Every structure is written in C-alpha cells, then in structure tokens.
Amino acid sequence: MAALSHRLRSFTRRFSSTRTTQRSGGGANTKVPILYTSPDIDSDPVTLQLFSWGRGASGQLGGGIEEIRMYPSPVANLLFRSDQSFSLAQTPGRIDADSSSFRIGISCGLFHSGLTIDGDLWIWGKGDGGRLGFGQENSVFVPNLNPLFEEHSIRCIALGGLHSVALTHQGDVFTWGYGGFGALGHKVYTRELVPRRVDDSWDCKISAIATSGTHTAAITESGELYMWGREEGDGRLGLGPGRGPNEGGGLSVPSKVKALTVPVASVSCGGFFTMALTKEGQLWNWGANSNYELGRGDNLGGWEPMPVPSLEGVRITQIACGGYHSLALTEEGKVLSWGHGGHGQLGSSSLRNQKVPTEIEALADKKIVFIASGGSSSAAITDGGELWMWGNAKDFQLGVPGLPEIQTTPVEVNFLTEEDECQPHKVISISIGASHALCLVSRSP
C-alpha cells in the first residue's frame, strides 16, 4: 500500500498543474489505477469499480485533468478475493445495521470527492480552504491517500461545501477545511489545513455523522444528536433560543439537540434544514420550510424537531436531504419525495413544489434499496443494481448524455465502455455533489 501511495502521489503531481478542460465520456488516463488489492488474491477476483461523471473543473472527477464527463467513467479499481465480504460505510441518512469491520464508502462535496477503503481515506478535488486535509490548499486531480489518518482507522466520511468530516472506528470525529461557518466545531471560526479532532461535547462514542455546506451533525451510540455550524434564523440546528453566546450567527461548538425527545440512528443535513431517523423508522425534521422541504403540508419552519404527520405508521429506512428537497425510502422499497421541484429533483414529471411526501410513480414497479440527493438532483438504486437519476442535468451530473437541463422523471444510467466487454454489473452505492457524482459498481468476472 505504501508503494502504491507513492506512485499515486507522483501521478497527482504530474497532473495537478493541468488546466485543459476536456469534454468526454472517459478520463485522460487509459489505465485505471488499482487502489486496493486483497491479500492472497485469487485468480478469479471480484472487481469493485469507482465511477465519476459530471463537471470536474476542480479535479473532483479524479481523472487527472479538468474535464466534463457526460457519462460514468472509471476512476479506480478495487480487487477482492471471490470469497471476501465487505459492507458499505455508514452513509448520512441511512441506518447502519452492518457490523462488518471492512467497509467501503464514497462521498461528494461541493467540488471535492472522497473514498474510504478499510480505514484508509483517499481524497481529491478542489483544495481551497484546506478541505482535502493535506496541510495546504492545492487542488488534487486524482485520488490521493491522506497520510494523516495512518493512526486513525476511518469508519466513514461526509464532505461538505468547503470542509470535510470523518468518523473513526474509535468513535472520534475529525474535521478540516474552511471554518468560517462554524461547521468544524472547533470554537474558533478559522480554517484547518489538516484533520483536527473535535473536542468531546458528548458522553460516549459517535456512531454517525452528516454535514451540509454550513452545518454538521453527529449521533452518539446512545442516540443523542449534536449539531453545530451556521444558523440564519431558519432553525436548522434544532437548538432553539439561548443556545450559546454567538446564537445570532450559529454555533461553532457541538451542542445537544435537547428538543429531540427520541433517540435517533441516522441524520441528513440539507441546505437550511435537517432530518433525523429513529431505529424504528420514524422521520423527524426541522429548519427552513419555505419550499415545503419539511413535508408538513405548510411552509412554516422552525427550530423545534417534529415528526412528519403524513408518515405516521410508515417505516422509513433511509433519508436524503437535497438543497431544498427531501427524499425518503420506505421499508417496502418505495421512494417518497417532497419540497422544491424546480429542477425536476422530485421525479414527479412536474416542476411544482410538493407539500407532503409523495411516492415517485415512475419507480413504483421497482424495489429501491438506496437513495441519494445532491443540491438539485436525486438518485435511486434498485435491488438488482440498476441506477436511476433525475433532476438538474445542466452539468451532466445525471450521467446520461442528451438529456434536457431539467429531467423531471427518473432515467436509467448505463455503465458500458469498451473495456467492460458488457460484463454484468451491479451498482451498490452513489453520492451526488453540486455538479458531479460518484458511484461504486460491483463487476462479475
């Protein structure tokens, strides 16, 4: 792994000064790097591929240059023994029920991307503010191993607009990047060029994290929710009046959401609102609601956490916040959407806002097992490994060439290139940024 890390760092330096923007379906490099190979690999390995697409002007696509990828193209390969098992890293909004220690996860920030493999963190993209955590602010155009986590095994990551958050297997939270919004949780509103541990405000280990462009959340093993970051009167932190000395502009240290009267298992941070999910599948939310992103039937927002009235008795297994819209996945595999629909992100064949959670009819005949939201786009993965996307397609972030800039209904994303030779594939995870996306695809020999 050390030799591989050295090769990739050299590879990064070769391309980091490139300023040519290309429009293509693939990256500049014909050979896809291998970021992980299982010990004692057999002759019939399983390949897990990382794909990217959309706008990559800051290197967030990981192809080595500034480019636009109109459809999914490989970034890296991970090789596993045919008998080796792994699980997905904890994803914001998704209840983590797997106890496996070998985890793989992805996350898209505004203009940067990350991949976790068995405790290691690979990160790339725009470096302004120190969001990559390498001690400087240079952009990185290919996946680069962050050596500062060699002593801390990473469980999962959540990338924000100008900052990054990581959770270790020991239950510690690390943040780095731009600190002007207070989203780092370090008391002072300054940038951090390298990962820094958030001082404990909680009594036990952290089990889940989430972040947006300006606020961050963490859940303890006992189900208590802590939040910090920017607050502009919308109530996104859920802390209410008298939350701290700097309550007018937010809170730069973690504070317990005392008004949330039930233990929660997962959390997702939207543009100006927050959603949390209990182990029993009950959805709570709070914050801004001018676009009906809380799904309560009116546009009255506020800091006080409340359950969604129309979802009483409905068991939710995953939630996903967009900039101004929300998604929820039911136990039966149905996708519900509500909030702002101006970019088609609700998947309802309309641009109208939706006041309450409504099933996406175009996916009604499919069983969905995973959902994701970007700023104004959405995605769903079926139990058969198909990927469907909808919403804002201006920067090709839906991965399907030829779409209108606003795609109001789900379209299937294909994964066929000359090198694939039409091998069977199964999408297992997706993350969406502002104008790009990543996914993990399992390929059979």
From Swiss-Prot:
Induction: Reduced by methyl methanesulfonate (MMS) treatment. Disruption phenotype: Delayed development including late seed germination and cotyledon greening as well as delayed flowering time, short roots and mildly curled rosette leaves in long-day conditions, thus leading to extended life span. Reduced root length is associated with a smaller size of the root apical meristem (RAM) due to a decreased cortical cell number. Reduced mitochondrial complex I abundance and activity. Lower levels of complex I subunits NAD9 and FRO1, but induced expression of the alternative oxidase (AOX). Regulates DNA damage response (DDR) synergistically with ATM. Together with ATM, involved in the splicing of the ND2/NAD2 mRNA. Required for the accumulation of mitochondrial respiratory chain complex I. Negative regulator of plant responses to abscisic acid (ABA). May have a pivotal role in vegetative growth and the phase transition from vegetative to reproductive growth. Keywords: Abscisic acid signaling pathway, DNA damage, Mitochondrion, mRNA processing, mRNA splicing, Repeat, Transit peptide. SUPFAM superfamilies: RCC1/BLIP-II. The gene is RUG3. One of its GO terms (biological process) is response to methyl methanesulfonate. It is found in: Mitochondrion. The lineage of its organism: Eukaryota, Viridiplantae, Streptophyta, Embryophyta, Tracheophyta. Pfam families: WD40_RLD. It comes from the Eukaryota. GO terms for cellular component: mitochondrion. Mostly expressed in roots and rosette leaves of young seedlings, and, to a lower extent, in the flowers and siliques of mature plants. Preferentially expressed in the vascular tissues. RCC1 repeats lie at residues 47-101, 118-169, 171-221, 222-279, 280-331, 333-383, 385-442. Its main location: mitochondrion. It comes from Arabidopsis thaliana. Residues 1-22 form a transit peptide. InterPro entries: RCC1/BLIP-II, Reg_chr_condens, Ub_ligase/GEF_domain. This is RCC1 domain-containing protein RUG3, mitochondrial. Interacts with ATM.
